[in-house]
Each structure stands twice: as C-alpha cells, then as structure tokens.
Amino acid sequence: MKDLQLVLFVLGAIAIIAVLVHGFWSIRKQQPKSMKQSPMAGFYKDQAKRRDSEGFDADGIGQVRVRKPGEVEETVIKPVLKTNLSQKPHSGTTKLTDTPLQDSLRQPGPHKTEPEHVEPKVVQPAQQSLFVGDDVKPAPTASTSMNTPKKIFNPSTSTAKLESYTGKPVAARPEPIKPPIQPAAPKVDVKAEVEEVKAEVEVKSTLKADAPVNEPVEPTDVLVLHIFAKAGEQIQGAELLPSLLSLNFKFGDMDIFHRHIDNAGTGKVLFSLANMLKPGIFDPDNMEQFVTQGVVLFMTLPGYGDPLMNFTIMLNSAYQIAEDLGAELLDGQRQPWSDATKKDYLRRLNAA
C-alpha cells in the first residue's frame, strides 16, 4: 500500500513538472523576437559601418533627416524668389516666330529657362466699383507684376468708358418711386347724420306708441287632463322624467314642467304639467325618489297661437305619457277619456 502511494506521488510530481515546462515554452514561443535575436540585426550593423562621413552608403542613399519648417522655407522659397527677380520683364504681347521646333532643338547653346506666362486676372465689376472712389492700389505680386502690363484706371472716367472697360453694362441707379397722391377724403357732415338718426328714432317711437299693446287677457276656461296610476301602483319619478324630456317638457316657473312653442324650451308656454298631489310641484334633483298617484296637464283659454293645435299637442303628449308609465288617461272630472268628452272639449275650444 505504501509502495502504491509512493508511485502515485512520483507520477503526480512528474505531471506537474511537465505542465510547468510546457507553459514556459508556449509563453516564450508567443513573445516577439528582439532585435538582437533577429537575423537582420547583423545586416543593419554592416550597413551602418559602410556609410561614409557624410552619411551616404554605397548606393548614395543617406539617412532620414527631419527638418524644421523654417529650414525648408530658406532652402526652397528663397531661390525661387531670386530667379523671378533676376528675370527680365516679359512683354504683354508675344511675338510669333517662323523658326520650327526642330531647328530650335538642333541649335546648341546654353539652356535658358523661359518664364511662364501668367494670364492677367480680370477684375470683376463688383470689385472695380470699390476702387472708383479709392486711390489705394493693391500691391503687385512678384509673378504678375513682371509678366503682365499695368492697366491704369482713371476714377474720373465716364460711365460709358467704365462699360467698355469691364465689358458689362453698369446697372442704372433706380430712381426713387414717389408715393401716389391719394385724393382727399370728402368731409362728412356729422351734424347732418346725427339729425337724421334722431329723426329715425322719433319716427320709430311714434309708431310704437300708436301700436296696440297686447295686454294679458284673463283666462276664461281651463282644459284639464289627468294621468292616473292603475290600482295598487304608483308613478315613479325615475320613469316620469325621461318621458317628459322626450316630449320637450322643460322644468320652469312654479316648480312644474312646461311645454313651450319651441322644442328647445323657449318662447310662449302652450300648456303645463303639475303633480296631482299637493303642493303640486316637482323636485328635479330628487326625481329618482319621487312617487305620486298621478299628474295633471292643463291649458288655459284663450292662449297663445291656435288653441286647437295646442290642445292636439297636449292630448298626444298625455297619450304618450300614459303609455310610457302604464297609467290611465282621465278627463277633468277624473273620468275615463271618451269620444263624448273629446267633443265637449272641442266645443269649449271653439267657444273660446
């Protein structure tokens, strides 16, 4: 048993050592090689030894040098300015020669650099108008002043000369537009208008005074219809109110409902509806708790408009309410409504 433990211990130690060795080897393999271990290190050292005192190698290639911006301007820009100033001014017109190009190439001689011809910049009309009143002239550049002829512009030239110089017509200055003269408004005689208005008011007042005044007439008769609940039943306010609103009744004076000439509830009253029980009024805020044995519809004679038409509307409304509530329609004496009672009511309407 002890020998087995020893063997396992040795095998475990060997496995741990193998894992560590493999890990170090893989890490070293992944690291980049340094310059000392690079095969090109010796090549760069040999190239450095072969450079001369000025820093150029056998092929004439020197080391890379970094120069400041000031050094570049001194070495490049200054020689260009010197060559431009040393050149002779070039005339504005070029002469054409008959010498062919091949002859000029065959002739030996020192090579001369011909100055490049720079086309003169044409000043726009908007820019020229700025110099008409100013005597300050722009400073000529080194390239354009030597190659282009100077054009002298005289500020005292006329408009026609300016048009010929620029090649574009100068727009004429718009003349100020004078506002149109409005005709004077005619004078209104205020006093005359006031007098006319006063005269119209006086005429209207006299017409109203002469017109007969419709004084309220005392009623001579009252037509009454009763809607009575059936035996053992009562009329519920929650059912009565929707029926009245559908028939265009409106709650109003004396705390009862009225039917007006207008369906919106305005105008003269045609007939009214009251509670059969005393005091005969309604409480619209508590109609759900309201109960009664019956209601009464009444219309006074004479009334507004056609009495026969008004009674027809009242009779139809009574029929509809009785049907909605399941009640009975009675006459003024609380008797069942009949044809004989209807004829009696028509006679009373004609007598009124």
Curated annotation (Swiss-Prot):
<comment type="similarity">
    <text>Belongs to the ZipA family.</text>
</comment>
<comment type="subunit">
    <text>Interacts with FtsZ via their C-terminal domains.</text>
</comment>
<comment type="function">
    <text>Essential cell division protein that stabilizes the FtsZ protofilaments by cross-linking them and that serves as a cytoplasmic membrane anchor for the Z ring. Also required for the recruitment to the septal ring of downstream cell division proteins.</text>
</comment>
<feature type="compositionally biased region" description="Polar residues">
    <location>
        <begin position="141"/>
        <end position="160"/>
    </location>
</feature>
<dbReference type="GO" id="GO:0000917">
    <property type="term" value="P:division septum assembly"/>
</dbReference>
<dbReference type="GO" id="GO:0043093">
    <property type="term" value="P:FtsZ-dependent cytokinesis"/>
</dbReference>
<keyword id="KW-0472">Membrane</keyword>
<dbReference type="Pfam" id="PF04354">
    <property type="entry name" value="ZipA_C"/>
</dbReference>
<keyword id="KW-0997">Cell inner membrane</keyword>
<keyword id="KW-0132">Cell division</keyword>
<feature type="compositionally biased region" description="Basic and acidic residues">
    <location>
        <begin position="111"/>
        <end position="120"/>
    </location>
</feature>
<keyword id="KW-1003">Cell membrane</keyword>
<keyword id="KW-0812">Transmembrane</keyword>
<dbReference type="GO" id="GO:0032153">
    <property type="term" value="C:cell division site"/>
</dbReference>
<feature type="region of interest" description="Disordered">
    <location>
        <begin position="138"/>
        <end position="160"/>
    </location>
</feature>
<protein>
    <recommendedName>
        <fullName>Cell division protein ZipA</fullName>
    </recommendedName>
</protein>
<dbReference type="InterPro" id="IPR007449">
    <property type="entry name" value="ZipA_FtsZ-bd_C"/>
</dbReference>
<feature type="topological domain" description="Cytoplasmic">
    <location>
        <begin position="28"/>
        <end position="352"/>
    </location>
</feature>
<feature type="transmembrane region" description="Helical">
    <location>
        <begin position="7"/>
        <end position="27"/>
    </location>
</feature>
<feature type="compositionally biased region" description="Polar residues">
    <location>
        <begin position="83"/>
        <end position="105"/>
    </location>
</feature>
<dbReference type="InterPro" id="IPR036765">
    <property type="entry name" value="ZipA_FtsZ-bd_C_sf"/>
</dbReference>
<dbReference type="InterPro" id="IPR011919">
    <property type="entry name" value="Cell_div_ZipA"/>
</dbReference>
<keyword id="KW-1133">Transmembrane helix</keyword>
<keyword id="KW-0131">Cell cycle</keyword>
<feature type="topological domain" description="Periplasmic">
    <location>
        <begin position="1"/>
        <end position="6"/>
    </location>
</feature>
<dbReference type="GO" id="GO:0005886">
    <property type="term" value="C:plasma membrane"/>
</dbReference>
<feature type="region of interest" description="Disordered">
    <location>
        <begin position="78"/>
        <end position="120"/>
    </location>
</feature>
